[in-house]
């Protein structure tokens, strides 16, 4: 069977599914902010509440995810062209960590957001992969990585 986008490796489907997973998580975190706005009476366009710290934690979990999303997606999509399984694994680790990060933050104790700190491993893996792909694309590196 021919892949829908022929110039991409067939395994790039894993990367595409990881992008869908990231979209799902980001939307879910946004829905949680919307629910918290109603519960804690924080009207638009206010980003934060002066009285409700728990709302601020819920909002911050979503905002931080949005801040990192563009860099994450660029790394995921670029590395995925050369190493789709590696990129998807790193991506799933990172995206899953965003749930743990958010749920820790939702307790109202910002230190508990560190429950999702393992996501740094996935993000760092993508950053190193992007550097490697860039160097290899320039023909400056004959080093082989087994992924």
Regions found by a protein language model. Give the residues of each.
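Cytosolic, membrane-interface loops and tails of multi-pass inner-membrane proteins
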Residues: 31-59
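Interfacial loop-to-transmembrane junctions
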Residues: 100-125
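Juxtamembrane boundary at the C-terminal end of a transmembrane helix
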Residues: 131-147
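Helical transmembrane-bundle signal
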Residues: 19-29, 98, 123-133
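Core segments of transmembrane alpha-helices
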Residues: 63-76
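Short alpha-helical packing/oligomerization segments
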Residues: 76-96
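Transmembrane alpha-helical segments that form the membrane-embedded catalytic/substrate-channel core
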Residues: 23-38, 95-104
């Amino acid at each position: 069977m021919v892949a829908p986008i022929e110039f991409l490796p067939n395994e790039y489907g894993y990367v595409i599914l990881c992008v869908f997973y990231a979209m799902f998580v980001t939307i879910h975190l946004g829905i949680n902010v919307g629910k918290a706005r109603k519960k804690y009476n924080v009207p638009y366009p206010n980003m934060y509440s002066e009285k409700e710290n728990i709302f601020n934690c819920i909002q911050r979990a979503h905002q931080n995810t949005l801040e990192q999303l563009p860099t994450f997606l660029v790394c995921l999509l670029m590395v995925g062209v050369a190493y789709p399984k590696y990129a998807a694994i790193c991506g799933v680790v990172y995206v899953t960590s965003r749930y743990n990060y958010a749920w820790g933050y939702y307790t109202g104790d910002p230190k508990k957001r560190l429950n999702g700190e393992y996501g740094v491993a996935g993000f760092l893996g993508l950053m190193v992969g992007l550097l490697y792909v860039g160097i290899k694309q320039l023909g400056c590196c004959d080093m082989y990585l087994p992924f």
